[in-house]
Amino acid sequence: MYTIGQVSAMFGLPVSTLRYYDKEGFFPNLERKGNIRYFSDNELEALRIIECLKKSGLEIKDIKQFFVWVSEGSSSYEKRKELFEARKSAVETKIQELQKTLSLLKFKCWYYETAMKDGNEDSINAMLPDKLPENIQKLYDKGHE
């Protein structure tokens, strides 16, 4: 069993967030002794799922719906799987977008490092758009997809 302060430290979440989740009903079996909340491994796993879904872009109301489905048992397996498939797809799309952004950022770092070394952009511009060094060309191409 863990106190709210311990869980806050474990997950890097403010205590206020944990209280909010509790108030929203995410921890229906949370043990209380006096005014102190005690989190079991079940609550920790629920918190991992909440944070995973939240980081995937799902809103709290939709995360609550997931937990309603969990309470329905095996009859909601398909809905839960579809939710996770959709979130996985959304995260994969976001990763692709970020990879494109990262490629362009890396290209521009090389671009300005080279321009500073040369004192101008002439040699770089002469190589654009398709005569760059191979590794830099890949970054340029990915960033300009």
Predicted region positions:
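C-terminal regulatory/oligomerization modules of transcriptional regulators
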Residues: 78-145
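Helix-centric, low-specificity signal for extended rod-like, repetitive segments
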Residues: 12, 41, 47, 73, ...
